[in-house]
Design a protein with these regions (language model features):
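Membrane-anchoring hydrophobic helices of lipid-metabolizing enzymes
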Residues: 1-78, 98-103, 107-111, 126
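Residue-level signal for alpha-helix termini/capping positions
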Residues: 55-56, 81, 131-132
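Conserved Motif II region of HX4D acyltransferases
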Residues: 59-66, 87-89, 126-137
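Carboxylate/His-rich catalytic cores and anion/metal-binding grooves
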Residues: 77, 84-91
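Short, solvent-exposed loop/turn segments at the edges of secondary structure
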Residues: 84, 106-109, 134
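A polyanion-binding, active-site-adjacent surface
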Residues: 89, 111-113
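Short beta-alpha junction loops
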Residues: 92-96
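Glycine-rich anion/phosphate-binding loops
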Residues: 116-122
């Protein structure tokens, strides 16, 4: 269930950990996606040959999913895992406030917060820096 907060906005920067990312990818692929909340047993990427060519050429790629379901971040994480590229997600700051453990894990997977109700310049500048440095967002 979604929970929203009236607490003042606090920026949570990305703090990626290769170990946490590997564990998160495994959990997502093996348990979360096929589990009862998502029921996704297989994911096939159409056009992955072209994406792989772009990645090999050093292109920086920005994915803009519609986010029509709660499965979208998990699906995009699996796409990134299959392509072998790092993920970085911009997530509503409310998600980081649900628990300290939740915030810690989300930051270690390379994600950072955004205030969707305002003009969050820190999140925008972070998105640009992440895109410049990791080749995908």
């Amino acid at each position: 269930m979604l929970e929203f907060t009236d607490k003042p906005y606090q920026f949570f920067p990305p703090n990626p950990s290769p170990t946490v990312i590997r564990i998160a990818h495994w959990l997502n692929h093996q348990i979360i996606l096929p589990g009862p909340n998502h029921r996704i047993s297989e994911l096939q990427i159409d056009g992955d040959e072209r994406l792989r060519e772009l990645i090999a050429s050093g292109a920086h790629i920005l994915f803009l999913p519609n986010h029509s379901t709660h499965s979208d971040p998990h699906i995009m994480s699996e796409v990134h895992r299959q392509l072998g590229i790092p993920s970085a997600f911009m997530a509503a700051y409310d998600v980081f406030l649900r628990s300290k453990l939740n915030a810690w894990v989300i930051q270690r997977t390379g994600s950072f917060s955004v205030d969707r109700e305002g003009s969050d310049r820190k999140a925008m500048s972070t998105a640009i820096e992440v895109l410049k440095s990791v080749r995908s967002l």
